[in-house]
């Protein structure tokens, strides 16, 4: 990223988007940072000493299509145009398929799927007029493979990936690219919220969690190219295994118990650490 650019990000009060906002501002870019929780967003800005001359903080409920229209239009008025839109806001609520409360089904679909669709739609219309632009949507490894214990969440991330790739096929000829980022588990407050949820054991499997720095690298080095890819998988080996299980779902029950055992073990370790820290 040589020249300075104008970015629009969602979910900036915490996690991946909070980290990326700080990095982008540190590189001299302008960021229109949004979150459903404006107070938490303002706290993040103070903690990170985000430069007021290059950042705008606004409340945005990504589930609200009208709010998307209004807030994105304000971003265009503020910066003149938006070069890159990152749909990062998401919601993870693990539960067994038959036990997930209906309100949690709605909330995950509304935030993870509709929020991304509304954001991509608004950003793409603006970018098509300019003949260039890039939309980056955070999907998940759960969009590459079935995830027992997170059936609804996985369904939303399959949807994000499918929508992003389909939209990119439509928009590339108009100079606008859409990239789906599909990471394995990332150490963020959202994942921390599932520490005591047994249904989330698969997301705690493996030898370690990804860091927000690794997502930063995946986006800046692998996604933001002259001709951006349709999707980026992080890390490569684990996501290749995920795709294998997706292509041959009958092998899933063979691998799942081992990964669930690993996840439960890690959850127990983290819970013990949490107790000792109290």
Predicted features along the sequence, with ranges:
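Active-site helix of classical SDR
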Residues: 120, 156
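SDR active-site lid
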Residues: 172-236
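Canonical Rossmann dinucleotide-binding motif of NAD(H)/NADP(H)-dependent dehydrogenases/reductases
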Residues: 2-32
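Substrate-binding pocket helix/loop in short-chain dehydrogenase/reductase
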Residues: 96-97, 101-109
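The beta1-alpha1 cofactor-binding region of Rossmann-like NAD(H)/NADP(H)-dependent oxidoreductases
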Residues: 59-70, 102
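Conserved glycine-rich Rossmann-like NAD(P)H-binding loop of the short-chain dehydrogenase/reductase
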Residues: 27-43
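Residue(s) in the substrate-gating loop at a strand-loop-helix junction
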Residues: 140
């Amino acid at each position: 990223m040589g020249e300075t650019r104008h970015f629009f990000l969602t979910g900036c009060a915490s996690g991946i988007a909070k980290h990326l906002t700080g990095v982008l501002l540190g590189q001299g870019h302008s960021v229109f940072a949004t979150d459903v929780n404006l107070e938490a967003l303002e706290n993040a800005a103070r903690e990170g000493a985000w430069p007021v001359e290059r950042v705008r903080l606004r409340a945005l409920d990504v589930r609200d299509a009208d709010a998307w229209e209004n807030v994105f239009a304000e971003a265009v008025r503020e910066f003149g145009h938006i070069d890159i839109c990152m749909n990062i806001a998401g919601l993870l609520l693990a539960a067994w398929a038959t036990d997930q409360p209906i309100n949690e089904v709605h909330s995950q679909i509304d935030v993870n799927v509709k929020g991304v669709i509304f954001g991509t739609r608004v950003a793409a219309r603006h970018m098509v007029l300019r003949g260039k632009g890039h939309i980056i949507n955070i999907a998940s490894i759960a969009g590459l493979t079935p995830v027992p214990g997170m059936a609804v969440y996985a369904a939303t991330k399959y949807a994000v990936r499918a929508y992003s790739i389909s939209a990119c096929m439509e928009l590339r000829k108009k100079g606008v690219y859409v990239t789906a980022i599909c990471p394995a588990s990332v150490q963020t407050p959202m994942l921390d919220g599932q520490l005591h949820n047994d249904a989330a054991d698969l997301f705690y499997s493996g030898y370690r969690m990804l860091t927000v720095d690794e997502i930063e690298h995946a986006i800046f080095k692998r996604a933001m190219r002259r001709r951006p890819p349709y999707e980026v998988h992080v890390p490569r080996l684990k996501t290749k295994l995920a795709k294998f299980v997706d292509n041959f779902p009958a092998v899933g029950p063979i691998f799942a118990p081992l990964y669930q055992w690993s996840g439960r073990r890690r959850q127990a370790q983290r819970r013990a650490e949490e107790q000792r820290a109290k």
